Amino acid sequence: MLNQTFLPASLYRGDAMHQWDIHTYANHYWHPVAPISHLQPGEVLAITMLDQPLLLTWPTGEHPRAFRNRCPHRGVAFRQGGGTGQSCRRLVCPYHGWTYNLRGELLAAAREADFEQDFDRQGWGLQELACRIDGPLIWIAFSDQALTLEEQLQLVHTEAGAAWNTASTLLRQSRSSLACNWKIAHDNTLDDYHVAIAHPTTLHREQGPVRDYRHRFSQHNNLLETPHPDGGRFLTFGLPPWSHLLVWPDGRLAWLEFMPERPDRCTMQLHLFAGSDAMDAATADAWLRDMLTFLDEDKALVESVQQGYQEDFQPGPPHQLERRILHWQGLYRERLGSAGNSIEERSHEAISALRS
């Protein structure tokens, strides 16, 4: 793995690469779109994922479902975005009154006897996306060619399955914008070379001495395992497409992801989960403060890297503690190759877009 080089800096900028990331690379994977606590049976939730308006529904007695948030008649959204689910029996288009159940089936269209052509309700259901629950999150896939969720979360299921399936209570969350390409933030969170240096009083105290670092890899996941000062294992997973999971020995989970926003900006989303009644509000607040402290330390670093990754920059040689970066970058190279484009071709597109 160490005979690889880092991705060229040109892949971290330019609209051509940004569009490929959100419209092609992203379609190879499942995406967590809401904590399960944000949607209950009999509710709907409007969200936006990668600039695409979506509608989550949970028909009573069934599993959650996901649809494009647009009426098949003229494309108007059924609902505007909201933080949590809202009770709903039927979805009614505000434009022409087409009415759907939570399964996405058309129940009625206003004055449907007056359409010029024969009108069949069954032909006008909502456009559905694959949707399922795994761990404390609701997931969707934009394409039927996406990796299976079992493959995407393989190491999580095998190494932290108990915590993953029991820490279902969302305690705290945070969302902020970073002035860097998402790949820079993702690389940084996979970078075990910098923790002892950049986070001596924060994350380093959780992960412990570098000599105790143990790495594991599956085809699509990587894992840093360290002994926690309080006993047990502290696990840090790197997951496609741009996600990270931290697991404490007591079963707490921190889910972190870097969502592409623009070529030079991404959105950092953090969710903290634990079992029911695992901690009081003050303890949860303190946990969030601790997480945001080390993430603020990283913010300064990744935004500086974005400035450094100008078109004449070539990244230096990888260190053995940067193997997790190389692992995911290898997967990214494969996706570029499967699209029929070499690294050099994509780099040229990115540079051309930057100069145009």
Q: Predicted segments — roles?
A:
Residues N27-I36, A109-F115, F237-W242:
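Short Pro/Gly-enriched beta-strand edge/turn motifs at strand-loop
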Residues M1-G14, G82-Y95, Q127-I133, A198-L223:
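N-terminal short leaders/motifs
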